[in-house]
């Protein structure tokens, strides 16, 4: 990545409550991504291995912006910002072609904060957003990315007149990853409103309600969705022959796509306390988290068919947790600081699965309730002086095991979900630093 920035700021004029400040600027970025397979990979020296395709991608981003801070009255500040971005199409100098198209958008943000008193602050904001997909999401050539995590029936078994490229019975099919040239940028509207209250110098409470609405949200069609409705997602199927296979079979293209709309709403909250304990030191405690009110999205290919993953394993092969919070207590005694951290995620309904009941020998459909998951972490820091310190920490202090889940979206990582719980159990680490 190469780039440059230019910025300038200064006071425009003065109001009774203070000076009105204006800042302007511009930035330029050139992103470059190159892949060159080795000669051995290209020439087949490596047994049973397909060389990755060669490419050399580049893209330019330009942006200009302006921001102003206005002291409306004593204690009340307003902020307004405007930005314009242009993101060029992607050039592949190796294959001598372009991907996507040049995209431009203007976005803005309005915010205000009102210091009602020394103890109470009110705040709020509203704005728009623009986010272009990364280069690989648009222009990466199709490559083999292993196989589907679960076994599926043939997506297109045919009408009996020929021999479709199906695998026998239920099987894992090759999964391909690559770019989607038709991928569009995400656009969003978001707003927040909240407060911070400090009744004493040793205690504070804060809460912010937030809402984000996405248009042309970038996500993907899961293998479950595609194999569950292959007719609707026929464009995501092709044929592919692995080096070890005698013939090509159907393969699933796991590409990023614009799923349509997404709506997320929640409340971020925090309690914090501080006190000095004679003979022990400074004790600081905080409790913060997010309460998710809504997390919905449209099914790929639709504009108003909403579904969600709130408190359950959703069609997008993910979970939106109703409650996530962290509690932390630190005691600083001279040069030594001890910190204990508690991390929590609420439980959820697992993916519905068909399993064999060993007591009856028959298949049955079940859906587990995955319990809440929490861990304790410890960290001790000793500062020898301003330059040197040593850290000793224990992650997952009480060796909590990941909760059982029957989801099958992570290949051979079965029985737990590595996105939400670590299989490493208790982990001890030691580190040090010296600044000079």
PLM regions and their residue ranges:
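Gram-negative outer-membrane beta-barrel transporters
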Residues: 204-352
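Outer-membrane beta-barrel signature, preferentially recognizing the C-terminal barrel domain
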Residues: 57-59, 132-206, 247, 252-267, ...
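Short loop/turn motifs that connect adjacent beta-strands in outer-membrane beta-barrel proteins
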Residues: 13-21, 72-76, 119, 201-202, ...
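Outer-membrane beta-barrel transmembrane domain signature of Gram-negative proteins
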Residues: 1-79, 301-330
